[in-house]
Amino acid sequence: MIKSLLSLLLPIVLAGPGDKEYKNPVFEPILADPTVVKGDDGWFYAYGTQDDWGDGKGSRLVPIVRSKDLVHWDYVKEAFLTKPAWKEKGGIWAPDVVKVNGKYHMYYAYSTWGDVNPGVGLAIADSPAGPFVDQGKLFNSQDVEVPNSIDPFYLEENGKKYVFWGSFSDKPTQGTYGVELSADGKSVPDLSKKFKIAAGDFEAVMIQKKGEYFYFLGSKESCCEYEKSKYHVRVGRSRSIFGPFLDHDGKDLKERGTGTLLLHSNDVYAGPGHNARWVTDDAGNDWLLYHAILKADPRVSTGANRRVLMLDKLSWKNGWPEISNAEPSLENRPAPLFK
């Protein structure tokens, strides 16, 4: 039964980048917490959290995959030659890769489960294919006085550079925050000038502008409990990166329990979330990459959650993003158009 189900869920393999249809997942076995950037060479590069894929090759120090069309992805290599050494224990999680001043910056989290002082670091490469050279720590949780400081996200606005971050905690100072970076994007001049935009029940912040609004997409609940994972994505919007970000009901995301549902589990996939920036294709359609867990095959041999890479189209209705049925697509769908 499981084999039959898996065969139905394998991505369609047709003629190549000109395919007119695709089917989830678009990459497996794992590309968790994905980020995507388009290189000067015309390829899309996606990156994921450090993970052991269960293939005997050990833990990959931020896997890199690439594609011409967001559908057919090929493994490239690990982003790092050696692991960043500014922290004693932990993994390299939730990388965010962007082009800054002609270089490729990777803002990443350095953490382990239950870490009392995780932090955010920076690595830089000349090419999106790496290798990325570590620049060290930007800040840790104690420095910035925000518990569980992970999941960084980079944003430029009005000529200024910012990093946003945050994850789950019930402590009063918890939440999703932003702070201005230096002009070169390599440091934080004043951590005391951080500003809060969302409550402590969000993580995996992604902010992107469309029209007059900035849209906040964040993930809630459990990311990594195999087929029982309850991760899901909620959205709010604001006319300013400083907020307030309000959901469809007008509630501020700085209040717990808010956010308009964008994406949640279905009978086949659990825990869809931690999306990348959406990508606009040549037809003007927006596409969202994220990870999810196939309930019928939720883990690899090492015990890691089998968080596969997923792709779905964003539609817009009255100024709000939607995904069909607010769940991962299962059937063949029209593919992104790239000429």
List each language-model region with its residue ranges.
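Carbohydrate-active catalytic/glycan-binding domains of CAZyme proteins
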Residues: L5, G16-K339
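Sec-dependent N-terminal signal peptides
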Residues: I2-V13
